[in-house]
Amino acid sequence: MDGYNQQQQQQQQQQQQHQMNLGSSGGILHSPQQQQQQQQQQQQQQQQPMNGSNNQLLGISNGGFGTMLQQSASLPINIQGSNSFSTFTPLSADDSNLKKRKIKNEDGTYSEIPYSPNSLVGSNGGLDSSFLMLQQQLQDQQQQIAQFNSSVNSPSFSLNSSQVNNNNNNNNNINNNNNSNNNINNNNSNNNINNNNNNNNNNNNNINNNNINNNNNYNNNNNNNNHNHLQTTTTTTTNNGLTINANNTPSQLSSSSLYPGIIPQISITNTQSGYTPRSISPNPSPNLSPTNSPIQSPHLPTDNYLMIGSENENSDPPSPMTQYNENPPFTWTDYKSEPWYTTFNTNGDEMPVPLLNIMASKGFSYIGGQWIYCRRNHFQLDITAVYPKLFQETQYGHNGVTLSNSSSSVDPTQTPSYMLISGVKTPINGLTLTIKGIKNRADMSQQESEVELFQTNSKREKQGEHAPKPVAIQFGSLVSIQRLHFRKATLNNARRHGQPNPHQEFNQLVVSLYGRCMGQEYCIVSYVSPALIVRTATQVTPPGDLSPVHTPDYAGTSSNNGGGSNNMNCFGPTISNIDFSTMNIVSPGHSPTSPRPLSQLTSQGQTNILRLTQNHNNNNNNNNNNNNNNNNNNNNNNNNNINNNNNSNNNSLGNINNNNSNMLTSSSLLNGRINCFNNNINNNNNNQHNNNNQHNNNNNHHNINNQHNNQNNNNNNNNNNKCHWNSGDTEKSIVYNGKVGINVENPAYALSVQGTIYASEGVYHPSDLRIKYDLKSIDSKSNLDNVNRMKLYDYKYNPQWTHMNGRDPYLDNCDRGVIAQDLQRILPNAVRTIGNKNVNGQEIENLLVIKNEALVMETIGATQELSKQMDEMKLKLITYESKLKNLKKKSKNQTILLIIFMITFLLVALYMYKPSTHHSHHRRHNFDNNDN
């Protein structure tokens, strides 16, 4: 420890000696008395209260840059050419003043503003020279920077190489306390002391980037009031150097104080009606909501849920910038075109009305006091259904007198289980979300008129368009309804005399939450969007004109809260926000991508100052001593994904140039394009990169590797316990090895389904002879006997059981079949148990199920037996028929013989009768003759 103190003292002495040498030779540093005065001024400003708790304005007062530059004869400025910003073009003042642009005022009139830089008037007066003179002076400064760099690189001007190398290549953290005696506590050592800067910070994600290059210390520290604000503190220089105010409180930054007589006062172009130039390149604004979308509902208390409602006492307070013509939120209101039904939890307790947190992140613009939508674009709705955490519960007596008032707290993500329908608690079978488009109605008593709202496929093909289908939702989970658009535009979109058409037609979106009970859908809650004007195409204005602020379209997402940007920290402004042709700095919050301006003019002669917005990014530890914090934050942001963690660490190292360039931009005004003191900013970035690399090589690389291995092991263990779906060998197929349950918590079989199964082509079972043995024939008489012993019943299912199976418990509960207990006595192998089953809170032990295939096989056997019996009956019938035929033939022959016999008998009798008659007549004749 003594050796470390001695080393500190030696470094302090070397630092003071080096300062004295530089001061005596006309160097860069101030005298000790001047440094002491500046440090005392810094301590006084530290004790002053900060103006505003959430929004700190970044700038450098005249005591900083202005004081130094008034003392210096010339400032070496090196402006590198780049395609990322506009270059200066020689224009005469007269020609540039001829070009003017129109600005629309609040009263509908237009005013003209010239494009020339001469039209820019600062708080300190107008321009001292024309734009051409300004360009010539800047070119002269480019020549001076070469001489200045050569003088800096000279041996008399060089610093101790070991000290510079230690600051640029080693992980040596400088903790500049700025004491009154101007003693620099340089805690640099080759032993890589761990994070000495954290002693002065209050558990914030502070950015502490320390460098010493030519005795210019860029020490960027965050405030200690739990807000990530940027402070720029460096030591001051005397001659031919850059002076930065070494104060902990941010001061005002103005171009006139930086370059008096050279660059005019810089102000932000802004109008009273909230318009911005369309030509500015869009950049994500960090002053957005946690969901990176301004078109949303107010927030739920203490959570990031987007609560919807016209009256919300518990919502977050509005932004302090609402007084500057901020766009109103895309507010959804209650829509009670049909009754809302009360819901209950699993315990039967009444629940409050659910909240639909709807976020419309794409497709809508606020123009002229109306929400505009282009029908050729698509929009997306992200919806979450939750219960409010706190709600008021009031009990009333029979005479309407209030008995008690109490507030209850509920779990926002719990799912409703019952719904009150006609005074009866009915189980809820499922929850669905529906979306539709309607025409705006002045009176709710008018009939609702729907408009065509379509949803396209991922390829956005017209053939794939269809009306939005109901989407299943669970409480607490996010559901995204994508690629929605209106088919037709609204009527009377044309304006009359510069005013909205009095006959303008509007469309609205309706989002409803339905619960399915007894085969029908019942509305639980419903919301309607603001009135929308649907246009065929967006209105195109000339480039010089001013267009309204547009809604951002965040196509990309990131694990960081950077508005879809890959940067770890989104500080503004960036290089794309500076228009060098007019020397206007456009605030990122006032760019076309954000409807909320960060700053706005209160008067034409007042100078706007840059404001560093609150950084909500958790990955602010992109410095040389917070690798462990980076690992933790990356694990939290990237869901403990080791790949994303490593990528985030690489991004944090790779994006140091961007982040630190943005931080130092506010102090140098040109976003790192002015390379002062032999490119100290690049050295600062390289220092951070090398410091991080060396620090990781010494300490954190092993920790990160160990953490990487541990996380891989944990992930492997977790993955072993999770379900894995794999793609099959054939096209469009998936494979899962295990038991699958549909509406079944603990499936006992490979596929357990609580409901109805539909198969258009049937179900096939293996029945190959090669997988069977010990075949025995079955007497079909036994099958017939078993079927005859079975009893069929007409019965009704329990309503709770019917509801569990997705059927109407009152209209679709009748069926016909056998009873498992009866079948078990006849066919024991056809009945099994699946264990206990809970039906509406009632436990059923050893629920019996039957195997329908066994009944089918018994029926087949019985049918075969009946077939055999029928065959036997047929044989008997044939025999009896042949016998009957023989009998018929015999009887016929007998009849013929009998007839013949009868005829013969009659003939014989007749013949015998005639002779006897003739003989008696002859005898009588003879007797008569004898008498005579």
Swiss-Prot record:
Q: Which GO molecular function annotations are given, in alphabetical order?
A: DNA-binding transcription factor activity; sequence-specific DNA binding
Question: Which ranges of the sequence are annotated as binding DNA?
Answer: 286-546
For this protein, the record's Gene3D superfamilies field holds: NDT80 DNA-binding domain
SUPFAM superfamilies this protein is in? p53-like transcription factors
Superkingdom per UniProt: Eukaryota
Q: Which InterPro entries match?
A: MRF-like (IPR051577), NDT80_DNA-bd_dom (IPR024061), NDT80_DNA-bd_dom_sf (IPR037141), p53-like_TF_DNA-bd_sf (IPR008967), S74_ICA (IPR030392)
Q: Which GO terms describe its cellular component?
A: cytoplasm; endoplasmic reticulum membrane; nucleus
> Residue ranges under compositional bias (Polar residues)?
49-59, 311-328
Its recorded name reads Myelin gene regulatory factor-like A
Give the organism, scientific name.
Dictyostelium discoideum
